Amino acid sequence: MQFESLAVDLRHWLRENIERGFGREALVQSLRAAGHPPKFARQAVDLALARAGRRLA
């Protein structure tokens, strides 16, 4: 999966919340609470963090 393949609104949401300082686990949990499968949530967040130049830990 590539960051660009994510829905535009999801990419925007991820960027916005990373800029606000939310960490990996908080973002993953939010996506899971919204109904996204665990693997997809982790991959999407990791891609967004990598794009933002943030650590994945």
Residue ranges and their predicted role:
Residues 1-57:
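Eukaryotic low-complexity, mixed-charge intrinsically disordered interaction/regulatory segments enriched
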